[in-house]
């Protein structure tokens, strides 16, 4: 799976089923701009093809068990990146203090 949008959709679907329009509104809240249907629906299709989400007859999307595992894995990965960034920031601050 690629792209920030796909992970954000999984994050949005972690608590409840939503249709495409509702997902678009949730994305708008988080990103400040609403992606077009031409952006949202291909991402949803890719997620479904990768067995990360389900879609029912009423066009409501939900996470699969695989989607939940992928989201957990992504969260751990992103947390590690931010942890490493914090450590690098501390290192840079300390090295600046040593120069003075």
Question: What spans do the regions from the language model cover?
Answer:
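Beta-hairpin "wing" of winged helix-turn-helix
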Residues: 48-58, 62-63
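N-terminal helix-turn-helix DNA-binding core of bacterial DNA-binding proteins
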Residues: 1-36
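Alpha-helix C-terminal capping segments
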Residues: 13, 39, 53-55
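Short acidic/histidine-centered micro-motifs embedded in hydrophobic/aromatic stretches
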Residues: 26, 43, 88
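Amphipathic alpha-helical dimerization/coiled-coil segments
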Residues: 72-100
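Basic amphipathic alpha-helical segments that dock to polyanions
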Residues: 40-42, 46-47
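Basic, amphipathic "hinge/linker" alpha-helix immediately C-terminal to the N-terminal HTH DNA-binding motif
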Residues: 59-75
């Amino acid at each position: 799976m690629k792209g920030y949008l796909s992970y954000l959709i999984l994050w949005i679907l972690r608590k409840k089923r939503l249709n495409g329009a509702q997902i678009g509104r949730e994305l708008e809240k988080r990103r400040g701009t609403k992606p077009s249907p031409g952006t949202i629906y291909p991402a949803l299709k890719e997620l479904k093809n990768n067995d990360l989400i389900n879609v029912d007859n009423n066009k409501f999307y939900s996470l699969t068990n695989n989607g939940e595992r992928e989201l957990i894995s992504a969260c751990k990965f992103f947390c590690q990146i931010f942890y490493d960034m914090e450590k690098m920031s501390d290192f840079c601050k300390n090295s600046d203090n040593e120069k003075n």
